[in-house]
Structure formats: C-alpha cells, structure tokens
Amino acid sequence: MSTNHLLEIKQYGQSIWMDNLTRDIIQSGELKDMVENQGISGITSNPAIFEKAIAGNAIYDADIEAGVRAGLPIYKIYESLVFADIRNACDILRPVYEASNRLDGYVSIEVPPTIAHDTEATISEARRYFQEIGRENLMIKIPGTEPGLPAVEQVIAEGMNVNITLLFSVESYVNTAWAYVRGLEKRLAEGKDISRIASVASFFLSRIDSNIDAKIDAKLKKGVDDIAVEAKLKAVKGKVAIANAKLAYQEYKKIIRSERWQELVAKGATVQRLLWASTSTKDPNYNDVMYIEELVGPDTVNTVPPATIKACADHCNVSDRLETDVNNAYTLIENLKDPDINIDLDTVMDELLVEGIDKFIQPFQSLMNSLEDKIKVLSPV
C-alpha cells in the first residue's frame, strides 16, 4: 500500500485542512473518511466554494423548494443551505476537535464579503452566524482589512473562534496577531475564560507569485539587453510567496516569545497559528505541491484544495523546511527593490487584498443570481 504523505506532515506539527465543502462529500461519507483516515483535520470555505457547490447541483433543490414554500427571501435560503452544510461538517469534525484538545476540528465560514470594510456589520454578522450555526468548533472568517481588525478583536473578546483571511503582507499578519492578543486581553480583563478560543491567520501564497510573475514576464517580454538583469528577474519568479511566508513565520516566533503573549499563555491562551492559504500552484511549470512542501513546520496549518490534497498524498516530499533558507528569503524580498527588478511589494499586497475581496464578492453575487433562477424554476406556478 502506498504512503499517504499527508499523514507524514502531522509529525512535523502542521495540520492539514481542506479548502472545500459540498453537500455531496458530506452525504456520501467522503468527508468522514478523509477526516478519519486521510489526515484532514479542518475545513475552510468561502463564497466561491459555495457558489460552485450550490449553483449547479440538484442535491440542494429540495431545501430550496422548502425555503420557497416558507416564503424565505433569497439570502435566507442561501444561509439555510450553507448553515446546514457547516453544521454537518462541524459534527463530522467534532471528534478531532475533542481529541486534539481544541487545536483542530474547525470549520470556517466567511461573513458576507460585501461587508469587508464595515466593522460593526462584521461584528454583528459574526455574532449571528456563531449563534445560529450553534457549534463550538465553528470558526468565523473575517477579512484582514483595516476595518476588519477591530472586528477581530471584539469577536475574540466575545469568545468566538476566528479565521482572519486575505492576509498577503507580513505587516498585515503582524497586525492580525496583535488584534488577537488584544481581544484575549480584553476578555481576560472581563474575568472570562480564554482557554477555549482558537484563531488562525490565513496567509495567502499562490496569488502573490501569480501577480509578481506577471509583472516580471511583462518586463522580460519588453526585452532586456543585459543578461545579468534578465537573470535577476528570472531568479525572483515563483519564489516571492514562499519567502514572504517564511518571514511571516519569523514574526510569529517573535510574537509568541513576547512577554505580553507569555502572560496570556499562563492564563490558558491558545496560540494563533499561521495558516497557509491559496496553496494550489497556478503555474503548470511549477511543482504542483511546492506551497505545501516548502512550508511544513510546527504550529502551522495548510488548507489545501481537493486536487492538491490528492497530489500531496501521492508525491509530497515531506520535511521540516519552514525555517530553512530564511536568510535567503530576506535577501530575495529585499532584492525586489533593486532598480533592475523594481517591484513594490507593498503595492502588490494592496492590489491583492482589493482583488481578493472582489474574488469573493463576484461568486457571492453570482450565487444569489443562480439561486434566484433556481427559485423561478422550482417555485409552484
């Protein structure tokens, strides 16, 4: 029997979550099998995932019809479908949640992407989601926008688990980590237990390389007269995301060594783990599991789409590489400022955050439109 390399990753202190959720895999028993036998210890979802799951699948039709008969508006029908799937996934993962002492076993659901820049609306929806879904191992996904951080702080203070998503820059990760700390401190000051709260910071990868590679390709296409300059440009391709992630992990280590964090640990706090997201390789010329292999290391999570899960199970070369070549990672990021390369990483990160929110709003709106069309077909005349 061939080795499932996903199971090896756990030995290095990294958890593998799946970036996918559909009713099919819940009802068929596939999700249960992946959790029990294949090393999957959490689930992340987003509007794009639910758009694919619901829009073209008859498995949801009976529930849609029930919503129509009950006179529910489209958005409430959408929530009834998604909340049911999230609850069932939480129940399947509950044994992992308990066996891992609440380290793993979480299912993430994102607040509506349309409120990514509205602090109060984000807090309000997080409360409602947590209450209505009613599962202790639920994680609320909140985008790491500037208005999102006060929401993270408040939601943590109220005792909810939080997945801060769409983090691209090291600075945005650090800001997120301290928002988690402030939320715990606030809760502690109110005399409440902080030992049952979990958080992950979702740090995105492949989108960074896709953006920067396109900029480099554009420079190369224009023509570069100097061979040395051409070599500099090519040396950066496909390397920035992993280097950036390694630097984020170094910041994580500084934070957990801080006196402020250690005081929270003494009161029972659980560390906020870095979660590697957007880990499917977009360029077919690259190793299809490079965003997994290069970032295996302790106290981290990698959320992986189904195709990449299969690829990694089959041929991942697993070792603890998260802290290898860290000096080279610093050098590579610094080299982006070289006049011959001239890529402003801060601008790239800002672009990606705007794009990231848009990439969730578009499928969310598309799903609302698809549901509206389905309702017309399924509604009694």
Curated annotation (Swiss-Prot):
Which residues does the Swiss-Prot or TrEMBL record annotate as the active site?
Answer: 141
| Compartments (UniProt record) | Cytoplasm
State the organism of origin: Nostoc punctiforme (strain ATCC 29133 / PCC 73102)
Its protein name is Transaldolase 2
Reported EC number(s) for this entry are: 2.2.1.2
An example Gene Ontology CC term for this record: cytoplasm
Q: Which GO terms describe its molecular function?
A: transaldolase activity
Pathway named in the protein's UniProt entry: Carbohydrate degradation; pentose phosphate pathway; D-glyceraldehyde 3-phosphate and beta-D-fructose 6-phosphate from D-ribose 5-phosphate and D-xylulose 5-phosphate (non-oxidative stage): step 2/3
Reaction(s) the record says it catalyses: D-sedoheptulose 7-phosphate + D-glyceraldehyde 3-phosphate = D-erythrose 4-phosphate + beta-D-fructose 6-phosphate
